[in-house]
């Protein structure tokens, strides 16, 4: 592998979980900078057609439970491995403990696959859920006290993959992604569900919207991910966000002004939950 003065010269990257908002934005970001991409897609995924193959983008069908097959499927090897793939990211599945435990195994399998592919660098996608409830600006030095299975598994995956990478002499970078919005965002996210309801002239029901939230556009998140692949420091955790938090109500008001001014937003219709995060 070739190195440049400021970091790795990335020629080819592997991405698991590439069909979401960040994954697709990262594909575009890497290709725009001359990096070939291998997108690892679940067999039978309804979102597989989002991956537009070309001379620069190759699609490989492989389930998270079979990542050990990747070295056979990607004969050309790679330099950087982005592991975004994760089962159970919404609703009750976040507290499916056996399912979340499997995600930790899959993350370790991803390290094994990355090593077999000759990757110098492994970058994992963690979450703000690793912190639990915290009143203040999030950064890598804030203690992590996750309160659901999803956050616990993400924290564990980050720590275990770091040790696994160290054992193999690979650079390890863990990201804690705050709130991302953009094209191909999940239908269950606050931004997308609010937009859909407003476009259908339905009243969105919300909390009071006093939570302080940090939103980042997916294209900007992808830029951060590319730069981490090139220049990120081994062993560090990076929070991926804009660095500026605003009351959630402000974001929702902006959506309302642009999507449908004639619909009243139902602020306060939904009470805060017992484990409500008020600062993200």
Positions of PLM-derived features:
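SDR active-site strand-loop-helix element
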Residues: 16, 40, 81-87, 122-128, ...
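NAD(P)H-binding glycine-rich loop region in Rossmannoid oxidoreductase-like domains
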Residues: 61-102
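Conserved Rossmann-fold NAD(P)-dependent oxidoreductase catalytic core, especially the SDR/UDP-sugar
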Residues: 87, 108-149
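N-terminal Rossmann-fold cofactor-binding loop
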Residues: 40-45, 64
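Active-site helix of classical SDR
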Residues: 149, 153-156
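NAD(P)-dependent short-chain dehydrogenase/reductase
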Residues: 136, 159-213, 218-227, 254-256
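C-terminal substrate-binding subdomain of Rossmann-fold SDR/epimerase-dehydratase oxidoreductases
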Residues: 202, 206-280
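N-terminal Rossmann NAD(P)H-binding glycine-rich loop of SDR-like oxidoreductase domains
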Residues: 13-33
């Amino acid at each position: 592998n070739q190195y440049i003065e400021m970091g790795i010269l990335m020629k080819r990257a592997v991405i698991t979980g590439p069909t979401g908002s960040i994954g697709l934005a990262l594909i575009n970001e890497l290709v725009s900078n001359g990096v070939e991409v291998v997108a690892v897609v679940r067999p039978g995924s309804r979102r597989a057609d989002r991956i537009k193959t070309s001379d620069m983008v190759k699609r490989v069908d492989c389930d998270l439970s079979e990542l050990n097959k990747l070295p056979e499927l990607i004969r050309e090897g790679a330099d950087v491995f982005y592991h975004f793939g994760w089962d159970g990211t919404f609703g009750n599945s976040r507290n499916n403990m056996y399912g979340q435990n499997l995600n930790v195994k899959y993350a370790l399998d991803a390290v094994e696959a990355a090593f077999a592919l000759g990757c110098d660098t492994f970058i994992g996608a963690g979450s703000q859920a690793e912190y639990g409830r915290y009143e203040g600006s999030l950064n890598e030095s804030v203690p992590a006290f996750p309160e659901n299975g999803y956050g616990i598994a993400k924290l564990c995956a980050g720590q275990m993959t770091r040790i696994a990478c160290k054992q193999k002499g690979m650079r390890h970078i863990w990201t804690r992604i705050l709130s991302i919005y953009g094209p191909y965002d999940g239908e269950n996210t606050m931004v997308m569900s609010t937009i859909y309801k407003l476009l259908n002239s339905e009243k969105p029901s919300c909390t009071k919207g006093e939570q302080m939230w940090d939103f980042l556009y997916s294209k900007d998140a992808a830029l951060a991910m590319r730069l981490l692949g090139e220049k990120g420091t081994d062993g560090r955790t990076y929070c991926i966000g804009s660095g500026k938090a605003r009351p959630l109500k402000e974001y929702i008001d902006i959506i309302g002004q642009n999507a449908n001014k004639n619909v009243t937003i139902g602020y306060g219709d939904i009470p805060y939950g017992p484990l409500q995060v008020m600062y993200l």
